[in-house]
């Protein structure tokens, strides 16, 4: 089954961008490459049970099994040793990426309290967007009774855009609610 946003991209966004930005080739039109969901575990690195809970929650949210990220070197100030677990991440591509973005735009972000839109200044110079969420409860898959602690996550949307303007225009076409 083709995802709704993927269909929107191929049928509406590509022709619009091809005309508006006057590309010479249809493959120059920016597209989504991947979405990376990352969650640092902080003080929970000593507790394997909490690590498994984070991994399970992220897998439920993303629809794909996550990977435990480990430290590359020891840092005494943070009480981190080499190869110690420091986070959990998931990289989404293809249909799962479009499905997650659809749920993020239409289900999760509207459930944020006092939501005014997301900050359009969080783009890097290559047109990639990074977003920080403060709680996992905004996703309908997460049940309030089953979580032990409210924690946030970082979401990075990687595009093939050449600059910030193209990236912003692409994500606006997908329906991400940016602040005015």
Curated annotation (Swiss-Prot):
It comes from the Eukaryota. It is found in: Plastid, Chloroplast. Its main location: plastid. One of its GO terms (cellular component) is chloroplast. Keywords: Chloroplast, Plastid, Ribonucleoprotein, Ribosomal protein, RNA-binding, rRNA-binding. InterPro entries: Ribosomal_uL5, Ribosomal_uL5_bac-type, Ribosomal_uL5_C, Ribosomal_uL5_CS, Ribosomal_uL5_dom_sf, Ribosomal_uL5_N. It holds the Pfam family Ribosomal_L5_C. The keyword RNA-binding applies. One of its GO terms (molecular function) is rRNA binding. Gene3D superfamilies: 3.30.1440.10. GO terms for biological process: translation. Belongs to the universal ribosomal protein uL5 family. Part of the 50S ribosomal subunit; contacts the 5S rRNA. Binds 5S rRNA, forms part of the central protuberance of the 50S subunit. This is Large ribosomal subunit protein uL5c. The gene is rpl5.
